[in-house]
Amino acid sequence: MNLERVSNEEKLNLCRKYYLGGFAFLPFLWLVNIFWFFKEAFFAPAYTEQSQIKGYVWRSAVGFLFWVIVLTTWITIFQIYRPRWGALGDYLSFTIPLGTP
């Protein structure tokens, strides 16, 4: 999609939809929102809706960073402690590795 062909009001509407969609446990939408609208929010000539778009881009970045931290922490903890959790660790695993922990 070429954002240059879309009206400023439509840009704001699209940015808002991606921002709200990220709350449905879809942090990838926040990443898309950041990439699509970063230049529009911070480098384009000023217009009425730009301050709202800037807010959505910042909040999308914070939400995406939060999810990256949470998922990285969980993956690290799970990889380190899964063998110690015994049956629970096996229950949470999709595949059970062979060998001894």
UniProtKB/Swiss-Prot annotation:
Reading the lineage from the top rank, the first entry is: Eukaryota
Annotated coiled-coil segments of the chain: none
Which InterPro entries does its entry note?
A: Gamma_Secretase_Asp_P_PEN2 (IPR019379)
Gene name, please?
A: Psenen
Cytoplasmic side residue ranges read 1-17, 37-57
Organism of origin is Rattus norvegicus
Q: What Gene Ontology molecular function terms does this protein carry?
A: endopeptidase activator activity; enzyme binding
Q: Where are the transmembrane segments?
A: 58-78
Signal peptide boundaries: none
PANTHER family, per database record:
GAMMA-SECRETASE SUBUNIT PEN-2
What keywords would UniProt list here?
Answer: Cell membrane, Endoplasmic reticulum, Golgi apparatus, Membrane, Notch signaling pathway, Transmembrane, Transmembrane helix
Subunit architecture: The functional gamma-secretase complex is composed of at least four polypeptides: a presenilin homodimer (PSEN1 or PSEN2), nicastrin (NCSTN), APH1 (APH1A or APH1B) and PSENEN.
Family per similarity comment: Belongs to the PEN-2 family.
Q: Lumenal side of the membrane: what ranges?
A: 79-101
Q: Does the keyword Endoplasmic reticulum apply?
A: yes
Q: What does this protein do?
A: Essential subunit of the gamma-secretase complex, an endoprotease complex that catalyzes the intramembrane cleavage of integral membrane proteins such as Notch receptors and APP (amyloid-beta precursor protein). The gamma-secretase complex plays a role in Notch and Wnt signaling cascades and regulation of downstream processes via its role in processing key regulatory proteins, and by regulating cytosolic CTNNB1 levels. PSENEN modulates both endoproteolysis of presenilin and gamma-secretase activity.
Task: Report the main location listed first in the record.
Answer: endoplasmic reticulum
Record's subcellular location:
Endoplasmic reticulum membrane; Golgi apparatus, Golgi stack membrane; Cell membrane; Membrane
State the GO CC annotations: endoplasmic reticulum; endoplasmic reticulum membrane; gamma-secretase complex; Golgi apparatus; Golgi cisterna membrane; membrane; plasma membrane; presynaptic membrane
**Protein name per the record:** Gamma-secretase subunit PEN-2
The record puts the intramembrane stretches at 18-36
Question: Which GO BP terms, alphabetically?
Answer: amyloid precursor protein catabolic process; amyloid precursor protein metabolic process; amyloid-beta formation; membrane protein ectodomain proteolysis; membrane protein intracellular domain proteolysis; Notch receptor processing; Notch signaling pathway; protein processing
Regarding the membrane, this protein is recorded as: Multi-pass membrane protein
